[in-house]
């Protein structure tokens, strides 16, 4: 009886080599990963690689680790994950690439009327992944044929969160994107995908939610059973994502890292039940750090100082973005919360 049981267990644990999934720095499929691209002026390193170094973690790592190479390598986590997008045998795949600052190689133009939101969906009929990120001009369209890192994205810090998901979770993501109103600059959603994912098809046509409520949250379950919660708002929501909704929804104070170099920055807010503090300095653990100011960091994330929530997304805290779509993806994974909580070195008081 032992042999059949062993075979059954192996079948349940086996992941096909070509399964669409987030891929880690190890070169193997992972349930989720976070890549934190470091600012060019932080830490040490040879000049040619300035702005291409990154920190990495997934469900198997013990906190932050140095990236295995450089962010522009096709052999690192981000390059491996996006590789199927650029392969010729992608006829059975569906994908959406969206960015309010699309690559120059695409025909799309920057649009302040669309959501301030950036991401990648890549899937087949079994599932795929959602990559939520902060990187302008990224990634290059599928027709480019190869993964690359945009030169404009070397200077400042950036975050990328990838989650592997079964197909059943993509209708929920489609709903969320009708709220965030993304600028889709490249996509393929044909046949069975268009039939089963009608909201995503509407998104590719530039459609969005037409009636209240102007915000939406959806629970998503990763391929390995990790729970994430997506928060999305349309422009007519008319308020800051963090102080106007997220803190109350999560029931916690928040420390928020965002791009502070744009006009109309919203100050730290202690007027409500929960405090929203703007992060001013970020530092990685260890003697080499590095530590850097928020003015050098284009990433968008927040953490509950007392736990257990951490969120990675694509929205800043400024007046303009109170009237734009966007969102964030949150989780209560203890290791991920601990990793981000340790990054906060200073906040602007109320």
Curated annotation (Swiss-Prot):
Ubiquitous. Its EC number is 3.1.22.1. Coiled coil: none annotated. Glycans are attached at residues 89, 215, 269, 293. Disulfide bonds join 22-162, 270-350, 311-330. Keywords: Apoptosis, Developmental protein, Disulfide bond, Endonuclease, Glycoprotein, Hydrolase, Lysosome, Nuclease, Signal. One of its GO terms (cellular component) is lysosome. GO terms for molecular function: deoxyribonuclease II activity; DNA endonuclease activity. GO terms for biological process: apoptotic DNA fragmentation; DNA catabolic process; enucleate erythrocyte differentiation; regulation of immune response. InterPro entries: DNase_II. It comes from the Eukaryota. The active site is at residue 298. Its main location: other. Pfam families: DNase_II (PF03265). It is found in: Lysosome. Residues 1-19 form the signal peptide. The keyword rRNA processing does not apply. It catalyses: Endonucleolytic cleavage to nucleoside 3'-phosphates and 3'-phosphooligonucleotide end-products. Hydrolyzes DNA under acidic conditions with a preference for double-stranded DNA. Plays a major role in the clearance of nucleic acids generated through apoptosis, hence preventing autoinflammation. Necessary for proper fetal development and for definitive erythropoiesis in fetal liver and bone marrow, where it degrades nuclear DNA expelled from erythroid precursor cells. Belongs to the DNase II family. This is Deoxyribonuclease-2-alpha. It comes from Rattus norvegicus. The gene is Dnase2.
């Amino acid at each position: 009886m032992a042999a059949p049981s062993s075979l059954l267990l192996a079948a349940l644990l086996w992941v096909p080599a070509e399964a669409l999934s987030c891929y880690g720095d190890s070169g193997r499929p992972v349930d989720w990963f976070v890549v934190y691209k470091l600012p060019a002026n932080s830490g040490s390193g040879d000049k040619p690689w300035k702005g291409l170094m990154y920190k990495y973690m997934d469900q198997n790592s013990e906190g932050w680790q140095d990236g295995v190479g450089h962010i522009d390598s096709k052999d690192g986590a981000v390059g491996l994950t996006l590789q199927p997008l650029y392969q010729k045998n992608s006829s059975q795949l569906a994908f959406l690439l969206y960015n309010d600052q699309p690559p120059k190689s695409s025909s799309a133009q920057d649009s302040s009327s669309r959501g301030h939101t950036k991401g990648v969906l890549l899937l087949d009929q079994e599932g795929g992944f959602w990559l939520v990120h902060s990187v302008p001009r990224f990634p290059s369209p599928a027709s480019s044929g190869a993964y690359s890192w945009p030169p404009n994205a070397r200077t400042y810090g950036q975050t990328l969160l990838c989650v592997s998901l079964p197909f059943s979770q993509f209708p929920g993501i489609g709903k969320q994107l009708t709220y965030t109103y993304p600028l889709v600059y490249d996509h393929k959603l044909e046949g069975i995908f268009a039939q089963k994912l009608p909201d995503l098809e509407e998104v590719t046509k530039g459609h969005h939610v037409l009636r209240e409520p102007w915000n939406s949250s959806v629970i998503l379950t990763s391929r390995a059973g990790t729970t994430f919660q997506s928060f999305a708002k349309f422009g007519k929501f008319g308020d800051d994502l963090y102080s106007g909704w997220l803190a109350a929804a999560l029931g916690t104070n928040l420390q928020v890292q965002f791009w502070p170099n744009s006009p109309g920055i919203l100050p730290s807010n202690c007027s409500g039940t929960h405090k929203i503090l703007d992060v001013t300095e970020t530092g990685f653990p260890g003697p080499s750090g590095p530590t850097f100011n928020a003015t050098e960091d284009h990433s968008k994330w927040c953490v509950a100082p007392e736990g257990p929530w951490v969120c990675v997304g694509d929205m800043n805290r400024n007046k303009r973005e109170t009237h734009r779509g966007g969102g964030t993806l949150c989780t209560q994974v203890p290791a991920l919360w601990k990793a981000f909580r340790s990054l906060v070195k200073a906040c602007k008081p109320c």
